[in-house]
Amino acid sequence: MHTRMQIRNRVNFGKITDLNLLPNLIYVQKKSFDWFLQSEVKDPTKRLNQGLEAVFRESFPIESPNNDMVMEYGHYVLGEPKRDPQECKDTDSSFAVPLKAVIRLIIKDTGEIREQVVYMGDLPVMTDHGTFIINGAERVVVSQLHRSPGIFFSYDQVRDTFSARVIPYRGSWLEFEMDNKGILVAKIDRKKNFPATLLVKAMGMGTNEEVLRLFYGSSKMKIAGANPKDLKRLIGRRTIADIINMETGEVMLDAGSKINEDNISILREMKVKEVDVIEFPKGKDNPVLINCLEKDGVNDYEDAVKKFHTIMRPGEPSTIENAEAELKRLFFSPKTFDLGIVGRYKINSKFEFNNPKEFSKADDRVLRKQDIIETVRYLVMLMSEAENYYPDDIDHLGNRRIRSVGELIANQLKLGFSRVERVIKERMTVQEPEQQTPQLLISIKPITAVINEFFGSSQLSQFMDQTNPLAELTHKRRLNALGPGGLSRDRAGFEVRDVHYSHYGRMCPIETPEGPNIGLILSMSSFARVNDYGFIETPYRLVKNGKVQKQVEYLTADKEEYHYMAQSNSTVDEKGEFTSKLISTRHRGDFPFRSPAEIQYMDLAPLQVVSVSTALIPFLEHDDANRALMGSNMQRQAVPLLTEEAPFVGTGMEARAAYDAGVCIVAKKDGVVSKVDATGVWIKEDQSKEIVHYPLIKFKKTNQGTCFNQKPNVSMLHTTTGGKVSKVSKERVEVTTPNGEKETHELLLSDEVQFHAVVKEGQEVGIGAPVAGQIIKGEKYGDFGQILQKGTVLANGPSTDAGYLALGRNVLVAFMPWEGYNFEDAILISERIIKDDVFSSIHIEEFEIQARETKLGQEQITRDIPNLSDKAFRDLDESGVIRVGAEVKPGDILVGMVTPKGETDLTPEYKLLHSIFGEKAKEVRDSSLRMPNGFEGTVIDIKRYSRETGDELAAGVEEMVKVYVARKRKLLVGDKMAGRHGNKGVVARVMAQEDMPYMEDGSPVDIVLNPLGVPSRMNLGQIFETQLGFAAKKLGINFETPVFDGASEGDVNDFCKKAGLPENSKFQLYDGRTGEKFINQVFCGYIYMLKLAHLVDDKIHARSTGPYSLVTQQPLGGKAQFGGQRLGEMEVWALEAYGASHTLQELLTIKSDDMLGRARIYEAIVKGIHSIKPGIPESFNVLVQELRGLALDIIIKDSEGLEVDISDYEDEFSKNKKKIKFETIENV
């Protein structure tokens, strides 16, 4: 029997976790781009007003300035991409589709309509994996986390004041806050200040009485016939309306005035029967608005609007028309002010206006008068400490939303289209109407410019992290609070970065970078999804009357506020009823106990709190959060290895992570394998009976230089001897060999791996002929990207093993100190690991050369290069390109190329000789592509592109060659390794296998870790993993222990017993060098270790002669610049402390930047002269020149008083300047 599969049974300890409910992990990206493009809508006229369609509709129609013509938009059409994604990567082009739009130009005088399909530029489109390919590089547009538009109320603890802020999606900000004088001030764009009541009056509430009645209740109090007690209660109250003397028309008491004893007697004299007084909330006198009314100084609508206009536009004439237009422009015009659908939704839910039908109306996305009035009312109530009025928590996820790919691109296009609109209007006025067509009027340059700028250089369009499948997946699920319109790293405080209770199930509390971006770059939790408004939702099971339902509901953070949530591990009986009378629940930031009747929802799974990366850490519940953070981040840096191996102890998330990352090839439809080889898999589909070919990607370079290679994961059963098929059933196929022996092939190997016979009884089969093909299932998805049926994984990608994520290898570990070689997290490894390529990986580098057309002639790719030995050409073909399979070292030629040299004026005789004999060496120089320093390997692929063969190349490029060099990297001393629990270290020594500590059965351990790395780090998960890993190895099964729902200590001990291992996993080890027993028993087991992308080969660097900085003449810094070491000021202090003057002088002059001195010392070494006179360092000359820039001249004199020339030139300035001479420091 021939099969490529090693089938291991799996034991899952999870009692609650159901991974089938997980949404597709890159659904965020795909859904957002589908929303933007609406490519699924068959009829383009039926597209919804969103994304790209909304951009067109907002920009059109465009009227000419003199109103004689108008340009209208019909619909847009998307073409087909010119190349497939892989071709785009190879040719450094973008994966994009041509965008065309049907545009009509209507001439108003004649009614003539000119319609054209106008090309609007190329629009990059998303690949199936949620990425974009821009100029050959795969990029990801990261979702941005920003403050949601809407109205926010905040409390300033320092000033003890409340404020309100209206934040639109686009337009002017409106703020209300208290000033120092106790007046409620409105601010527009943080510049113009005026009393808040002025704005309220300008919206139609003209008089003080109208304003007061709008915000306060009132009650009538008797004066006539009232007893003294009642009259006393009237003192201190405020009138809500003006009290006017009916006979004279005089205002006796203004609205809002306090009533005192004198007022009462005047009112009694006037025979006023009763007065209307203000009813303040909670009965507290709060004169905020009354102070405002006194300050605003107007008492009717017209005056209010005019005063508002004068404040906003001082110097302009304030007519009622101008003033109303200005107010409309600021807050009530869809052109200049847009709350967005989200802003309107937030305002409606804040003030409980329920009018969802009006959401889509454009007018509804501007402010309404009611919104401003309600904002002021809410603020007044907050100041009055009224019940059920609270300030907003700015860090709550109900107030922060996600801007995904589609929205980010749409915002960029809006900018481009606004520039196009300006160009169109200019062209409409310049050209004659008869000659104009849509094509001539529209300039697409602004559109292509914003698209290229966004994808090429925006902070949110990032070069995809492709180190391994997990890095790829996490990058697409990342949330970034930085970027345009977001926070800035320097100004973000502690509160924004901190974990908030509303993050539960929405954003991972663990996965975030260490360093300045901590808490600003986050990851979505595993079950989270983004709703239509951009708010993150998380799923819960519904609880009705204390019974848990099967129904699942997704809630946003602000909807969750009002409910009590039970934990997913609360005990429930078969009927779905809670077994306890009091249940631990979550409510806002608190954890109260509640009866089952009070609970409305229950968590779906313990896993929903954390992100995919964190969900891959087994026994996470036993790890400290800081170490779990490191573990999550380091898994993304694991290099794909030569031989992948799934972990013995996983979490059950490995299969889904590998599946959704898109590195594996998955069957689209049900069928049976009909052929498998290294280049592809062929499936005969059940329905169509067609044979479908799935090609494999072989040895491609990723963005990070790791190797992307796919290997078949399905197989066929073949006969070894051939013969006649004697029996075919569902269970097995029997073949009778020519000798009469029977060869049996079992078809049902496991639940997952089953075969279907491809031969019939009585059929003759040859040696090695296939008798059965593996049964394949096609994938099926639900509406929200959740998997209904997983497709069979036909081929494994990098870091995957049988469809499971496999980032590292299981190795036998002993936790013990060993001769100090594992001091401070260092790691001791066995030579077997290197010999058997356990941690070897393949890395691929791409080298590129372009032959251009220069002023002096064309560069040529050729083998004919002057002044080189034959040895240099040994691996080049006849056209000068290296052969595939050649071993290359630093300095070797990969592609030979010559460039024409500039010729000096030659004598006529020389030219004549030159034309007769044609000396090639004189006219060209060698500009070949050579292997750079520090690189070596094997050439695995060559790609050639030329204009002659019709390839599209950049301007001026005639030919381009790419050479791919692969290199096998074994584990070396200095390489960084890590486990999944933040237990990282550097390989300190590779030891002979026979010298490693060995167990009683003679098997040496693979790796020795320091036990002191565990207690202080508090990551005990690695101890449980090691112990259970040993049991898994012995029993031949793989364990899955989901986070917060995994194996208990008892479970681990039970499986250790079954495997015949001690419960504490401690063993007697022997010293490999002496054979003696170690005094104490040692904790051993199998741990999953990763090799990280911090390889010592990429970091080690030595410089002989290299580049110098032009100004200071000191070596450059860093490996990339081939730099050298710098003797900095601290090193100088160290030498000064020892008084090592000669050493210091030597280091600061001839060994550094004394240009003449360093040339002389070379000569002295060659001639064997031991004394050398130092000169002046170049950095001193820099200092002198800087002082000269301050019009100071420095002259240096030697011991005999003679001037030392420090400058190579004397300019006019230095001859005529005033000389400042000094010999001693005092003179200065």
Swiss-Prot record:
Q: Could you tell me one molecular function GO term of this UniProt entry?
A: ribonucleoside binding
One Pfam family in the UniProt entry = RNA_pol_Rpb2_6
Quote the cellular component terms of the Gene Ontology held in the record.
DNA-directed RNA polymerase complex
Record-annotated disulphide pairs: none
Among SUPFAM superfamilies, the record links this protein to: beta and beta-prime subunits of DNA dependent RNA-polymerase
Q: Which family does it belong to?
A: Belongs to the RNA polymerase beta chain family.
Q: What does this protein do?
A: DNA-dependent RNA polymerase catalyzes the transcription of DNA into RNA using the four ribonucleoside triphosphates as substrates.
Protein name in the entry? DNA-directed RNA polymerase subunit beta
Which organism's genome codes for this protein?
A: Leptospira biflexa serovar Patoc (strain Patoc 1 / Ames)
Classification of source organism = Bacteria, Pseudomonadati, Spirochaetota, Spirochaetia, Leptospirales
